[in-house]
């Protein structure tokens, strides 16, 4: 008892509280209550059929159910009030009433879900028409009616999908921990973009709001060295389980299968780990991440790393948000589920199976028994950058073998590498200044855009990465689902020691990754084995002697950035103010680049003038 209050005082307080009229509690996500057990000793033997209490099915999609209820209210508002302005006001009043009654959560009535409500309203209208047709028909019919309804539902989803209506899917660019990135063409402006699709499964109210909030944070990242963000939206996708597959062949499926076939040949980059950002103010007390990393260092010294992001504990609900690699169910027109495999089977996503929740396994079993599911798909439209720093380094390494004189080979020139690294540090300084830690900086997540090869940091995930599980991480294949307080994320060769060890990390973890990238920029490698050996040796302070002699300043900062003590690593601001970028050679390099750009502009202007003079001569 706090405050030294008496028992009588507490009783009086309780009586006063009971007499007051309290608002009904919000029925957001009711906690499951175990079934009561009764004494069945006197029950006849023939009636003792069920020895165990019946397991009531769980409902992990309460958010989707509330969204459907809100859509019904909006639909009724439009039916009873033809005036659009008045119907909107009626809808808001109805929502406020239902919120006060505790039947709805306020966030489901927000504008962020307007596109989903439009999807629902169209589906409701279609179903009402179908029901009317059914009533007017002969009730004694075969089952072809339900098949007809199912095909109409799928066609309706295609009509209400913004992604299918506005974009043409051209190719798959790669995949990360939260979804796949596709190269698309906008049907209206004809421009090419990159769209990342993230499948949201079993979303709770709190986690949905986190996703929406953090998408807005990503939209606020405006910097020349950050991949441009255009827009984001949420759609419903209809996922059919394998036992209810619909034999529909679509062009988009064929295109996807071709690219997936090319992936094994190196045509599609398969990200080694999930890329994500976190807010710098997050502390271990607020996080409960779980990850299991498998580092294999075989005879060829090739190191592969698999990192799994896990759930941050939520006080409001046991269920959590799961962002899954979408596979073939990224659009409403793709009924065949590829990644929803039975427990114990592996998908094409590398990684150990983990679980932080005993109830998650039950949810999976329920998913396996369900005929159809409706999920939310988050689409993030970004600037298209097809050339990554990984590609540039690979090409540089190939050309360095052919170049005898380093000064004559622009792909190995230290000045070019310095320019790339400086722009990279400027981008990292910007995101750190915004309070964001990337956690997975590596050449595959860094892009070179345009003719001047401007550096763009990309492949940002969501700041709620610690409450997210990948599809392959739902359940541990070894049956070990005990959560641990570790946070091993990032790719092994570029991840800091504190990340791999699961201890606390901050922006200095990104600085370690920059140190490894700095070494790779200034040290060409002849083979993959040599690269893996050198980058692994950096962890123990070993830097190639040839690099130390050729680039002593860079070697010095590589040593500082890759030190085990994170506090002693220089920050991004300290790097920008260091001798790395303040030498006379770098100033001359910048001036030379500007002169070259001006010369190109002069040549282009001369060509345009000559064309104009020719046109005038023809007219005369």
UniProtKB/Swiss-Prot annotation:
Residues 18-28 have a biased composition (Low complexity). One of its GO terms (biological process) is positive regulation of mitophagy. Metabolic-stress sensing protein kinase that phosphorylates the alpha subunit of eukaryotic translation initiation factor 2 (EIF2S1/eIF-2-alpha) in response to various stress conditions. Key activator of the integrated stress response (ISR) required for adaptation to various stress, such as heme deficiency, oxidative stress, osmotic shock, mitochondrial dysfunction and heat shock. Synthesized in an inactive form that binds to the N-terminal domain of CDC37. Has to be associated with a multiprotein complex containing Hsp90, CDC37 and PPP5C for maturation and activation by autophosphorylation. The phosphatase PPP5C modulates this activation. Homodimer; homodimerizes in presence of heme, forming a disulfide-linked inactive homodimer. Interacts with DELE1; binds both to full-length DELE1 and processed form of DELE1 (S-DELE1) in response to stress, leading to activate its protein kinase activity and trigger the integrated stress response (ISR). It is an enzyme of class 2 (transferase). A motif (SIFI-degron) lies at residues 85-104. In normal conditions, the protein kinase activity is inhibited; inhibition is relieved by various stress conditions. Inhibited by heme: in presence of heme, forms a disulfide-linked inactive homodimer. Heme depletion relieves inhibition and stimulates kinase activity by autophosphorylation. Inhibited by the heme metabolites biliverdin and bilirubin. Induced by oxidative stress generated by arsenite treatment. Binding of nitric oxide (NO) to the heme iron in the N-terminal heme-binding domain activates the kinase activity, while binding of carbon monoxide (CO) suppresses kinase activity. Disulfide bonds: none annotated. It comes from Rattus norvegicus. ATP binds at residues 173-181, 196. Its main location: cytoplasm. It catalyses: L-seryl-[protein] + ATP = O-phospho-L-seryl-[protein] + ADP + H(+); L-threonyl-[protein] + ATP = O-phospho-L-threonyl-[protein] + ADP + H(+). PROSITE patterns: PROTEIN_KINASE_ATP, PROTEIN_KINASE_DOM, PROTEIN_KINASE_ST. Belongs to the protein kinase superfamily. Ser/Thr protein kinase family. GCN2 subfamily. This is Eukaryotic translation initiation factor 2-alpha kinase 1. Its EC number is 2.7.11.1. The active site is at residue 440. GO terms for cellular component: cytoplasm; cytosol; nucleus. Transmembrane segments: none annotated.
